[in-house]
Design a protein with these regions (language model features):
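Active-site-adjacent loops and short helices of periplasmic peptidoglycan-processing enzymes
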Residues: 25-191
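Bacterial N-terminal signal peptides
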Residues: 10-21
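Domain-terminus/edge residues, biased toward the C-terminal soluble/receptor-binding domains
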Residues: 157, 168-173, 177-397
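Low-complexity intrinsically disordered segments
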Residues: 8-11, 253
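Bacterial Sec-dependent signal peptides at the C-terminal "C-region" and cleavage site
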Residues: 20-29, 374
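N-terminal secretory signal peptides that target proteins for export/translocation
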Residues: 1-6
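Sterically constrained small-residue positions within well-ordered secondary structures
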Residues: 18, 31-33, 53, 256, ...
Length: 397
């Protein structure tokens, strides 16, 4: 009976303590600037912490931010060798006649995939996006289904796509939170291709001269900004997902992509092109100056070593598979301390990567964040005699 009660208490303890991923700072954080947008979000990508937000789960029209998901599927096709950058794709009548922003391709052309990607990202070309969608999915309709399937797989719970390019359509909506999930996964999953988002100017040979500059004005203002995408429709307003990476020698961890500290800002529904750039720049500046990123533990470093019952090994190391980085208000690093909360007792078998506890990061008495701790090694179940002996020890414990 005592063992049964202990096991049930352990299960309950695990359920209430270990279900969350990284949570944002609890209180007394620096006040964010006033942001003139319907919704916004600032994420410290390196620490995986939301630093500031407004209406992050409000349904909004994404406009050309839709093309982030279209690019995700194109990059996935490149990675799986279903597409090649030098491969050419035809331009259908449907792609040619797409309204809105264009790269000005026509049905007489066979356009390399690499150029279509540049047209989609730099020029925000709806024609390029449609040509890629048809090339990857076989049809736009099939591609849209792939977009929705991928959104579900990524955990984008409040997103629904109706087209590949982002033109206004009933039910074509997303949220700032879902866009942050998509943007971070786009960068981490496809580091070989996200460089397309830093291209400042592009025009496909033989097409008429137009505004060939990337609509992300921050690329021209801030050398640390290297993406990602803008969008506009009358319904959506002016929107932007921007990201910047700054090197911090004392941090020494991998950002996304490359080293240093990376922030991601999302502003939705601003008044004009300059406003979306200004509000994004304001958020990024505040995030880099009001917070600092601190590396507490290396990847695969044991935060704590815990006893294991009924296992072939008597102990298991708990830690993180990636370096543990936290974002804290500037000037509070000296006050940081950690507190480990873990399932007890730990009973084998235990799988490598299994969540078994949390580490709380405190600044004085204030909770900054808490992060899951996982088993860094697998522990197999002991033999019959070993399990029986530990069962007795647990009973009298």
């Amino acid at each position: 009976m005592k063992s049964l009660i202990a096991n049930r208490l352990a299960t309950f303890f695990t359920a209430i303590c270990l279900s969350a991923l990284v949570v944002p700072a609890a209180a007394q954080v620096p006040q964010p600037p006033e942001v003139a947008a319907r919704a916004y979000l600032l994420l410290d990508v390196t620490a995986n912490q939301i630093l500031a937000s407004k209406d992050l789960d409000m349904a909004v029209e994404p406009a050309s931010l839709t093309k982030l998901m279209s690019a995700y599927l194109v990059f996935d096709a490149l990675r799986s060798k279903k597409l090649d950058l030098k491969q050419t794709l035809p331009v259908s009548e449907r792609a040619w006649k797409m309204p809105g922003s264009r790269m000005f391709i026509d049905p007489k052309m066979q356009v390399p995939v690499e150029d279509l990607i540049k047209g989609m990202i730099v020029q925000s070309g709806n024609d390029a996006t449609m040509a890629l969608a048809e090339g990857v999915g076989g049809s736009a309709e099939r591609f849209v289904q792939m977009m929705n399937d991928q959104a579900k797989a990524l955990g984008m719970k409040n997103t629904g796509y109706k087209n590949p390019e982002g033109l206004t359509e009933a039910g074509h909506t997303t949220t700032a939170r879902d866009l942050s999930i998509l943007a971070t996964r786009l960068m981490s999953d496809f580091p070989d291709y996200v460089g397309f988002y830093a291209i400042k100017k592009y025009r496909y040979p033989g097409t008429p001269a137009a505004n060939d500059n990337n609509r992300n004005l921050l690329l021209f203002r801030d050398p640390t900004v290297d993406g990602l995408k803008t969008g506009f429709t009358d319904a959506a307003g002016y929107c932007m997902v921007a990201t910047a990476k700054r090197d911090f020698p004392n941090l020494g961890v991998a950002g996304t992509p490359g080293g240093g500290r990376r922030l991601l800002s999302i502003v939705l529904g601003t008044a004009n092109e300059n406003a979306r750039a200004n509000e994004s720049q304001k958020l990024l500046y505040w995030g880099f100056t009001a917070f600092e990123a601190i590396k507490l533990f290396e990847a695969d470093q044991a935060v704590v070593t815990a006893d294991v019952w009924k296992g072939k090994q008597p102990h298991v190391r708990l830690g993180r598979s990636q370096a543990m980085v936290v974002a804290v208000p500037a000037g509070t690093a000296a006050k940081l301390k950690t507190q480990v909360v873990r399932t007890d007792p730990l009973v084998a078998p235990l799988a490598k990567g299994q969540t078994l506890g949390t580490v709380k990061v405190m600044a004085g008495e204030q909770l900054v964040t808490e992060v899951p701790l996982v088993a860094l090694d697998a522990v197999e179940q002991a033999g019959v005699l070993g399990r029986a002996w530990d069962a007795i020890r647990l009973w009298i414990r």
